[in-house]
Amino acid sequence: RKGIEIEILGIESKLNTELVTEKSKIKYKLKGTVDRIQSENGIIKIIDYKTGSFQPYKLSFKEYEELVSKKKKEAFQLLCYCLMYDKNNEKQISLNAGIISFKNMNLGLMSLKKSNSVSFTNDELSTFKETLDKIIEEIFDTNLSFSENESLK
């Protein structure tokens, strides 16, 4: 598009970060490979490519707790990438993220959206980390037993 300045910051960029849960101080690592990171008119965008068909509704949510659903796994993945990018960069930034599906190229970049907002600030990512911490805490809670979630089948 005319007037848009894009700078490629990374292709197949390996990201990782070490985090600690607030409650029990459990240390854990996140790592992943982002297909593309770019700056578009000064806005950082995390982009994941999918070879199959993909629908934009899978990237929309209102509360972070929704991301535990198998139907929102791509949104969860993108937020993990955003959190890792944020933790590896000292500047206070706002991130956008999305998916480009090769089978739905006509849709262009399908943006990750929380309550119709496509920007994820440091504060938003801190709130997502709290959700991630809860998951880690549950995994390590010896008082909880694991069972298959019927709703995820």
Report the location of each language-model feature.
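RecB-family 4Fe-4S metal-dependent nuclease core
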Residues: 1-153
